[in-house]
């Protein structure tokens, strides 16, 4: 397996990562375990999940149990921001939600740190300054190693870059957007923005 640095960070990840969206929904625990063990056998060290995957965090729960004996050898990426229940502060990028969401993910994953913590989508109701300050606090506390974004447009990624610079806060190191042979829209603006600003 080849390894690459993620963005402009020192974090090395396997060239191929395993998406765990189906764990807890289409794949039960034993099926998920078989998939993860095969991935480990093939040299995959990057595992991507989210609090919302599997319905109510089951993907994180499955992944945490399966990787328990391999924690120091793998990179766990998870996301927050999608709706996780009824009532206020159950989604988005507010400080209040982020601080609760990270504790919930840490508990489900059975770990004391998350390698890569990503906002699942932009939050139009919360200033990016608030989101970045909260994430920076988590990095300083050691609960999160690196931060990233998912489903951001190029202008949002660029704005976040310059806001993090202005605040002297931890910057995003990753962008996780839909990209495949049929959907190559990110090549027009997001990829050049990430190449320019990290």
Protein language model regions, located:
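Short, well-ordered coil/turn segments that N-cap beta-strands
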Residues: 11-16, 43-46, 70-74, 110-115, ...
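Active-site mouth loops of central-metabolism enzymes
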Residues: 20-30, 84-99, 120-126
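Conserved, mostly hydrophobic/aromatic
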Residues: 6, 18, 32, 47, ...
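Generic structural signal for well-ordered alpha-helices
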Residues: 3, 36, 60, 64, ...
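Short, acidic/polar
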Residues: 27-39, 93-109, 157-162
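N-terminal binding-site loop/beta-alpha segment at the start of enzyme catalytic domains
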Residues: 1-75
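Active-site beta-loop-alpha junctions enriched in small/polar residues
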Residues: 21-23, 50-52, 79-83, 119-122, ...
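Beta/alpha (TIM)-barrel catalytic core signal, keyed to glycine-rich beta->alpha loops juxtaposed to Asp/Glu
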Residues: 126-198
């Amino acid at each position: 397996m080849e390894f690459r640095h993620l963005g402009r960070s020192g974090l090395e990840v396997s060239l191929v990562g395993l998406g765990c969206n189906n764990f807890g929904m289409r794949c039960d625990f034993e099926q998920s375990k078989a998939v993860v063990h095969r991935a480990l056998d093939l040299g995959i060290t990057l595992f991507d999940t989210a609090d919302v995957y599997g319905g109510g965090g089951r993907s994180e729960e499955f992944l945490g149990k399966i990787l328990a004996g391999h924690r120091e050898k793998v990179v766990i990426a998870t996301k927050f921001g999608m709706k996780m229940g009824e009532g206020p502060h159950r989604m988005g990028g507010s400080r209040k939600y982020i601080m609760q969401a990270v504790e919930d993910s840490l508990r489900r994953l059975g770990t004391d740190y998350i390698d890569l913590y990503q906002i699942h989508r932009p939050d139009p109701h919360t200033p990016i300054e608030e989101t970045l300050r909260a994430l920076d606090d988590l990095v300083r506390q050691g609960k999160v190693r690196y931060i990233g974004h998912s489903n951001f447009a190029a202008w949002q990624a660029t704005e976040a870059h310059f806001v993090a610079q202005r605040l002297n806060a931890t910057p995003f190191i990753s962008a996780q957007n839909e990209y495949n042979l049929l959907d190559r829209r990110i090549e027009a603006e997001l990829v050049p923005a990430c190449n320019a600003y990290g």
